[in-house]
Every structure is written in C-alpha cells, then in structure tokens.
C-alpha cells in the first residue's frame, strides 16, 4: 500500500489518540535507519517504530522489540539526551504531506517549559528523522543534514 498524505493523516490521528500525554522512557536504534521510542501512557507501554529505509518507510505502533545494539549511534544518544523523560504534547502532519511532527515538552532548570520537535519525513529514499529545538533549529538528524540551521519543510509537490 502506498504511504501518501491521506494514510499519513490516518496514522497521525491514531498516534495522537494513543500517545499524547505519554512519557518517553526508552529510546534505541536497532539499525541505521530505524528508531524505537518507548512511551508510557496511562499504565500502558507503547513502542513507536520509525523506519526510514527506502523500501519500507513507515511510522507505527508495535509490540515487537528488536535487539538493542551494544553501542548506540550518535543520533540515538542525542535523542536520549533531549527526549528521555519528556512528554508528548502534540502529534500532527503538515497538510497532506508525508511529514509527521511529534512535539515533546519538558521543564528546564529554571522551571520553564521547553519544546523539542521530532520531524519524521516519509519520502522513500529521501526519508529522514530530524530533531529540532524550540526555535526550529536542527539539533541532529538520522541522515546527514547540516546542524544549527533553521528547518524548512520539504516543498509540496
């Protein structure tokens, strides 16, 4: 089945109903193009699977866990640094594009709320997962992008 804008909207609707308000308790990257995020919501544990392989790109909830590599990738370590123990505040898609935005909230040292965004671009061989700060500046990405630049979404087709 093709993963188009309508399917993206449906998946985002389901993720929104299941994960908003959930606390991030685990993050690991079983392969170079996959991220698994453990989310704890109302006594239920979910695993959010993000896969950006060119042939099998997707974002979904899963019960299957894969073995965790002994050494975590740089991107995985950055995700853990910024997203562990945060809460999912909102999940949405950009129009009818295959771009999913997951917003996380956390308190900083001075008890102010900070927001981080995880952008999931589901575009075949151009798929990517990008971590942004509260000013939409790129912190890191799964596939190489220049960091410290302002994120701009892909142009609509």
Model-identified regions with their sequence ranges:
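Duplex nucleic acid-engaging cores and interfaces of nucleic-acid transaction enzymes
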Residues: 2-146
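Conserved small/polar residues in nucleotide/adenosyl-binding loops
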Residues: 151-156
């Amino acid at each position: 089945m093709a993963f188009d804008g309508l399917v993206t909207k449906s998946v985002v609707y389901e993720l929104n109903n299941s994960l908003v308000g959930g606390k991030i308790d685990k993050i690991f990257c079983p392969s170079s193009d996959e991220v698994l995020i453990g989310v704890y919501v109302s006594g239920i544990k979910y695993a959010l699977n993000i896969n950006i392989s060119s042939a099998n790109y997707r974002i979904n909830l899963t019960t299957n866990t894969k073995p965790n590599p002994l050494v975590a990738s740089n991107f995985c370590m950055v995700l853990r640094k910024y997203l562990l123990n945060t809460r999912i505040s909102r999940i949405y898609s950009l129009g009818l594009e295959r771009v999913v935005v997951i917003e996380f909230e956390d308190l900083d040292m001075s008890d102010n709320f900070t927001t981080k965004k995880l952008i999931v671009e589901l575009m075949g061989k151009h798929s990517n997962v990008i971590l942004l700060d509260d000013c939409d500046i790129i912190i890191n990405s799964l596939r190489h992008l220049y960091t410290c630049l302002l994120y701009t979404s892909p142009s609509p087709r």
